[in-house]
Amino acid sequence: MDKLQKTLEEWKQMLDPEQYNVCRLKGTERPFSGKYDKVKTDGIYHCICCDEPLFDSTTKFDSGCGWPSFYAPLENSAVIEVRDMSHGMIRTEVVCAKCDAHLGHVFPDGPPPTGLRYCINSVCLDLVPRS
């Protein structure tokens, strides 16, 4: 996969302020505030920055954490997991493999079959419904 590279200024022109803060500056939207937290529409969730397909709605579940949660990415190659030691915690950050957008974090407390919970900011996603 070819990486999509832009300067921070280019991203700032392309994204709204909240998208820029979360996707490029590694911010986090408030829990239960994102538009996809409770959505059950069948489709594919794409990266808001580069339109790369990231998650399938069939792997989405209600974790109760306030952010959309998935037990697996669409393809393992769609995301990259990075050790995150910010805020006095050790976590695993999830970024888009194509454009390095910060998406959220993955935790080992999800349902079968993976036991993982990809906790993703709604503002980083664009849901494309299946026809």
Swiss-Prot record:
> Which Gene3D superfamilies would you find in this protein's record?
Peptide methionine sulfoxide reductase (2.170.150.20)
Q: Does the keyword Ribonucleoprotein apply?
A: no
Catalytic residues identified in the record: 119
- Is this entry keyworded ATP-binding? no
Q: Which GO terms describe its biological process?
A: protein repair; response to oxidative stress
What positions does the entry give for Zn(2+) binding?
47, 50, 96, 99
Q: Which reaction does it catalyse?
A: L-methionyl-[protein] + [thioredoxin]-disulfide + H2O = L-methionyl-(R)-S-oxide-[protein] + [thioredoxin]-dithiol
Listed under GO cellular component are: cytoplasm
Which EC number(s) does UniProt give? 1.8.4.12
**UniProt keyword list:** Metal-binding, Oxidoreductase, Zinc
Q: How is the cofactor bound?
A: Binds 1 zinc ion per subunit. The zinc ion is important for the structural integrity of the protein.
Ranges for domain MsrB: 8-130
GO MF annotations in UniProt: peptide-methionine (R)-S-oxide reductase activity; zinc ion binding
According to its UniProt record, which cofactors does this protein need? Answer: Zn(2+)
- Which Pfam families has this protein been placed in? SelR (PF01641)
* UniProt record similarity statement: Belongs to the MsrB Met sulfoxide reductase family.
Q: Give the protein name, as stated in the record.
A: Peptide methionine sulfoxide reductase MsrB
User: Origin organism of this chain?
Assistant: Pseudomonas syringae pv. syringae (strain B728a)
Q: Which gene name does the record give?
A: msrB
